[in-house]
């Protein structure tokens, strides 16, 4: 159903500040697919809009129910998230279109009505293909010496969306990418295409308004590819938005493209991928359908009294106009949020189509959360449709709140509690368990056998072994069996790609690693004396000329003690050993041992440190020859249990980059063991 506005100009959604459009570049649509297994009938619908509020979609569902009989809790309606469509609600600095808002629910309902009228015998199938080259993390971590100021005047921005291409102020992505392009295809029993639902985690491309962006162009181009342009009833293609809260098409680690990205060209590439993938789909004449929904109560983050006072003072200076700056904009948001209830009911859904699972969340969801839902779901494959059945703003994973940025700034578009994302995951997984009748996956045991590297480490019987595959903190799980779990401290981004060699992972999953952005991991290891070893993989992101010490990888010593008594392994900076490994035993003894090899940044390296009494030896990248070798007294108190990963025991010069596969031994590893461990990983890509 065509839902392009009938009257122009209109206010356009998706920007911090107000913008309008008086031209329609391409048509907007509400597209619907209705499925029926003779027991359950469900409607899946996408709307070419940025966000659609729950009251609007509830109104559309009621109208559709009255026309079709489909229960309102068997309808999944989502916004595509084009940033070139009319606003349906006032967010940030955007204006409103009350006439368009009143007109739209009936048009959405009409899409459900027409799809229901076109029900016919069909077969269904699904598949998933990977498209990692077309979506990337758009939220990047800033250098520790270049932290930015938020609209409230606080120096808090360690991560931000859209850093710009190869911006030297930024280090690397703050989150993982979900590269899956999921496809559900419906055909007649004879093989004529009827409809297709795709799902991809990519925010939008960008198009001049009014436009459906690539979501609409994808539907048009796929219709042409399957050669059913004039079919009756017409073929309907839907592109739903996955968990793209922090994902976009730009790869900010590369040079800026010579030509701007066209939403039409982008849609063509994705449509061709889908078209090719459909050739290998196995179809089923019947599959069971099941759908459940719930509402999850989530708190609105409270405003502090000082911020509210400051907001009132600032908004008084522009009472007769719209905000023009970010401080003005967010001041107005604080006033508006101070007047809303302290809790929201967030709608969630789960849909089963045979062995396929679909989750629906009414928020802007980060890629990590989508990957977590996929990993835990009892149904395989599973994908998530965001901005479904309402709009409740960004829900960053909890660790991202410590890094700041506009997806964490308190506004109507980002106001839910810090723990919202894991609570959503838990509720959605419970719904998927209900519709499937199966328990969630645990990500351990025989379903996920270990690769050669972790097997080699475990065979050497470490006192502690942290693989750092966690989706979230605060617990860093010790996989040695010795119960030396660690604690992730704030300033860490989770679940990015770790050392990529197959030996480091298991046969089913990418090896994962956290990015340390000012945070560290601390743990207590019982039974350590002055003879012990530590090994790990690391990938430094901070330039070696940024500060006196580039960053500490490992530290053993009492926490927070002045002078940092202990063993400290790191990468030198401008003070000494620039870009090379160094060992330091604290300010009292001041023994510094420095390696010879310059450590290339943004590449994975393996390091092992062995203390045997006064002798300290460090090995790099599996070499039998020591990188560092010398005598250094232990300055930590006897039998010190405290160890730190990614930082020093006094918090000085914490590491900036990724660390993975950390093992500590209560004995000296031999050079031969270290070399064999490194070899077990295989060839590691940068």
List the predicted regions and their residue ranges.
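Conserved beta-alpha junction segments in alpha/beta enzyme cores
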Residues: 1-78, 82-236, 242-253, 257-268, ...
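Extracellular/periplasmic catalytic domains that process cell-envelope and extracellular macromolecules
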Residues: 36-38, 69, 175-178, 187-191, ...
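Short, solvent-exposed loop/turn and secondary-structure capping segments
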Residues: 87-90, 136-137, 249-252, 397, ...
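Extracellular structured ligand-interaction cores
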Residues: 121, 179-181, 195, 234, ...
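Flexible glycan-contacting loops in extracellular carbohydrate-active proteins
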Residues: 628-658
């Amino acid at each position: 159903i065509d839902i392009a506005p009938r009257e122009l100009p209109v206010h356009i959604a998706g920007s911090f500040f107000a913008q309008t459009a008086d031209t329609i570049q391409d048509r907007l649509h509400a597209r619907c697919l209705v499925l029926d297994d003779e027991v359950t009938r469900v409607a899946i619908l996408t709307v070419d809009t940025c966000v659609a509020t729950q009251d609007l979609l509830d109104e559309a569902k009621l109208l559709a129910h009255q026309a079709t009989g489909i229960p309102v809790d068997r309808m999944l309606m989502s916004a595509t998230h084009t940033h070139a469509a009319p606003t349906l609600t006032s967010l940030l600095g955007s204006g409103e279109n009350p006439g368009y808002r009143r007109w739209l629910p009936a048009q959405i309902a009409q899409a459900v009505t027409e799809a229901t009228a076109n029900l016919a015998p069909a077969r269904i199938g699904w598949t998933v293909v990977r498209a990692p080259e077309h979506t990337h993390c758009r939220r990047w971590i800033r250098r520790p010496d270049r932290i930015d100021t938020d609209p409230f005047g606080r120096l808090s921005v360690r991560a931000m969306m859209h850093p710009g291409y190869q911006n030297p102020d930024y280090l690397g992505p703050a989150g993982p990418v979900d590269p899956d392009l999921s496809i559900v295809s419906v055909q007649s029993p004879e093989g004529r295409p009827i409809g297709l639902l795709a799902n991809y985690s990519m925010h939008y491309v960008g198009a001049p308004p009014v436009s459906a962006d690539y979501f609409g162009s994808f539907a048009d181009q796929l219709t042409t590819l399957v050669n059913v342009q004039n079919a009756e009833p017409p073929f309907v293609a839907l592109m739903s938005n996955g968990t793209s809260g922090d994902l976009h098409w730009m790869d900010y680690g590369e040079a800026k493209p010579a030509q701007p990205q066209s939403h039409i060209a982008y849609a063509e590439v994705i449509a061709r991928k889908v078209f090719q993938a459909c050739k290998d789909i196995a179809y089923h004449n019947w599959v069971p359908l099941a759908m459940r929904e719930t509402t999850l109560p989530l708190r609105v983050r409270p405003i502090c009294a000082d911020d509210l006072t400051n907001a009132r003072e600032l908004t008084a200076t522009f009472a007769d106009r719209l905000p023009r700056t970010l401080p003005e904009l967010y001041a107005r948001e604080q006033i508006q949020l101070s007047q809303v209830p302290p809790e929201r009911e967030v709608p969630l859904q789960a849909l089963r189509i045979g062995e396929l699972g679909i989750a629906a969340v009414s928020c802007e969801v980060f890629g990590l959360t989508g990957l977590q839902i996929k990993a835990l779901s009892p149904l395989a494959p599973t994908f998530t449709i965001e901005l479904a059945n309402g709009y409740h703003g960004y829900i960053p994973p909890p660790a991202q709140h410590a890094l700041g940025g506009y997806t964490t700034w308190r506004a109507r578009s980002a106001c839910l509690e810090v723990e919202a994302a894991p609570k959503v995951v838990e509720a959605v997984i419970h719904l998927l368990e209900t519709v499937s009748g199966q328990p969630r996956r645990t990500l351990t045991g025989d379903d996920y056998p270990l690769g050669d590297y972790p097997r080699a480490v475990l065979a050497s019987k470490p006192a502690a072994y942290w693989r750092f595959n966690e989706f979230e903190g605060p617990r860093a799980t010790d996989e040695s069996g010795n119960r030396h779990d660690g604690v992730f401290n704030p300033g860490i981004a989770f679940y990015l790609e770790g050392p990529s060699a197959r030996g480091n992972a298991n046969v089913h999953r990418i090896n994962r690693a956290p990015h340390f952005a000012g945070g560290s991991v601390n743990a207590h290891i019982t039974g350590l004396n002055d003879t012990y070893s530590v090994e790990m993989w690391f990938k430094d992101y901070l330039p070696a000329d940024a500060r006196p010490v580039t960053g500490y990888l490992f530290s053993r010593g009492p926490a927070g003690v002045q002078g940092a008594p202990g063993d400290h392994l790191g990468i030198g900076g401008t003070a000494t050993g620039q870009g090379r490994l160094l060992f330091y035993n604290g300010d009292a003894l001041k023994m510094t041992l420095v390696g010879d090899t310059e450590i290339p940044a943004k590449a994975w390296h393996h390091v092992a440190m062995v203390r045997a009494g006064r002798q300290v030896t460090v090995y790099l990248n599996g070499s039998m020859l020591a990188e560092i070798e010398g005598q250094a007294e232990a300055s930590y108190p006897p039998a010190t249990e405290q160890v730190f990963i990614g930082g020093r025991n006094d918090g000085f010069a914490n590491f900036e980059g990724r660390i993975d596969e950390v093992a500590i031994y209560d004995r000296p590893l031999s050079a031969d063991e270290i070399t064999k461990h490194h070899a077990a990983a295989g060839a590691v890509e940068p």
